[in-house]
Amino acid sequence: MKSLLFMILTFFVIDAGIAQTLKGIVYEIDENQNKIPLIGTNIFWEGTQIGTTSDEQGLFELEKIESDPLHLIVSYIGYQPDTVEVPLEQDNIEIILFVNRELKEVVVTGTSLSKYFDELDAKPTEIITSKELLKAACCNLSESFTTNASVDVQFQDAVTGAKQIQLLGLAGIYTQIMLENIPTLKGVTNTFGLGYVPGPWMTAISVSKGAGSVANGYESITGQINLDYKKPDDIERYYFNAFQSSHFKTDLNANAAVQISENLSTLLLAHTDFVTKTFDDNMDSFADQPEVKQFNFMNRWHYQSFAGYESQFGIQIINENRNAGQISETHSGGHSVHPYDINIDTDRYELYAKNGFVFNDEPYTSMGLILNGQYQNQNSLFGLREYNSHLRSFYSKLVFETKTADEVHSITLGGSYVFDQYDEKFNGFNYFRKESRPGIFAEYNYSPIPQLAVVPGARVDFHNLYGTFFTPRLHVKYGIDENTTLRISGGKGFRSVNLLAENMNYLASSRQFAVINNPTYEEGWNYGFNLTRYFSINNRDFRVTADFYRTDFLKQTVVDIDSDVRQVRFYDLDGKSYSNNYQVEIAYELFERLDMMAALRYSDVKTQYGDKLLTKPLANRYKVLLTVSYATEERDWLFDTSFLLNGDGRVPSTIENPVEYQRPESFSEFMNINAQVTKKIDVVDLYFGVENLLDFKQDNPIIASDDPFGEYFDASLVWGPIDGRKFYLGLRLSVL
């Protein structure tokens, strides 16, 4: 750790030297042919991380590098990026950016958008930028969706602090999570994996509903979440973030980028977070949050040959220790009983390499090779229950892409190979599984006019345990007019079941695991549509988005906690299992620098449990979200607030328990309010905020907390917040 800190400090004192300066201005041309300065345009030298952004007048200054000719890359959300050749002797330049031909409905009024829909993608993809992520504490991925209506995040139990996302009303195991299009956070990583992604490392999150691209595998049933991390050639050179909450959580992040040569650059990212003090506000003898110590390190490299070859490669190392459970002894018959302790130790290593080749004689043809290896070792103890897991995973993909010069036709072909080895031990039993699955895929994109794109795709995978999987998918995008876009999608998905790893929350209970049918894989169809419409009100865009998605399972492993209060049963679906998800969202700039977003989402999710078709337990039926953001004229003060109304839902029956251990069979709606104030001082941001302002907490979330080793103990029936109101403050330093 000392060596790491020394390296980071060394990078901060590297002198860039003295160089000539290029001065310039970036603007657009409005309807009256007036020049309008663009604020916050990204400007950097090609193949380097040396860059800057334009100021309030569209002006910028940038030191020249030793290259002749110089190539300047200029980009701005909603506009066509440009690469400008700058003669070495030129010291001043004017740059004009033009609105993207397929983004005519997006009006950018002097500031970059913090959240927007990718109008070029046939899939309905929402881009959450780093600007949006900064509107909340966002210490890790689980805290990155507080201003997003599509994705829910909730606690999995009342003791470990584990969180899980939900998309289209279904658990996160049906959503494929990727790191820059490489599958990650799967299998045994699923339970605590959201905490392994530091918020300050991310530059954007892409959320796609429905069936994803076949090029990324067959796992996405409800959607895909793709994470973009900071890169060695980004314009940010140094970054530091410090965060402290009133619940005794400390979060520290630092990263430094170094241009080693014209072709090679590297980025070091370091993260640590720790909670060293517990508390018990509801007086049930259990800590309301776990003690956590995490160390997270990543080293990324980027090589650019400028001759058609590009490579990115890196390594990530994670060590986490998590302690939870009782913080005071219980008493039985006048004698003290040893506290119920939970200990979870995790070591995780991940390597990746992405290689791209562009053929000089075929400028519209490219080939890519992606390699990824993961290893994770986790040892855990829940009271008297011991659970240990090991994951060894290898992923490779070779992809070939070509398109016609007019971009009417393009095709993507490729093959992949995935190897996963799971070794799980639970209460003396060993669950060992090796999965080997080569696959091939093809995806065709037909776009005869800019308003229309039809993308059919299919893949075939050969699973060593479960046979052949055929995965067809289709995406269609049609621009009804310049302000209205309709997207339709449909497709099949598969996933292997990891019975223990995906249900660790039930280890924090006395429920016995009853496996009626050995789990294998799950199979489902997803289909739906997304309609986006822009209206012009007071020369500002009023966006309305409506979508509907349905998921039908053909094969599913049912997790039943209704049939027996002392068991969690696993068996094959015999009947219906589906999800209908409806969502409407509006977004508008009420007046200059005051942005508003409001959304309503309703989910109808039912599964056959024995002879009963029941609503999914412990999940809200609807969600209402309102976010308001305001910036002062100088944009040195930022104010962000979110109001979230969580709807009611069903609680599994506890009628078999003694009266004192019974719970109502439903929960009521509740409100959650978050707010944050940010002060910008040159390269420093100071921020202060509050989460769960109304201090709402689920009453008595742990059943039989006074007898944790008894037969009725259950900490898994969680539907609301466990800890109450939380204040936090922090500091961010970013040097370009």
Show the residue positions of the predicted features.
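A beta-strand signature from Gram-negative outer-membrane beta-barrel systems
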Residues: 93-95, 196-237
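C-terminal beta-signal and adjacent terminal beta-strands/loops
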Residues: 596, 645-654, 678-736
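Gram-negative outer-membrane beta-barrel transporters
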Residues: 447-450, 548-552, 572-654, 732-734
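Extracytoplasmic beta-strand/coil segments of soluble accessory domains associated
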Residues: 142-183
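Membrane-embedded beta-barrel scaffold of Gram-negative outer-membrane proteins
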Residues: 366-380, 479, 487, 520-572, ...
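Short, acidic, small-residue-rich periplasmic hinge/interaction motif at the N-terminus
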Residues: 31-34, 39-46, 73-79, 89-134, ...
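Flexible loop and strand-edge segments within Gram-negative outer membrane beta-barrel domains
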Residues: 274-296, 302-367, 373-392
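Short acidic/polar hinge/loop motifs at secondary-structure boundaries
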Residues: 60-63, 164, 182-209, 297, ...
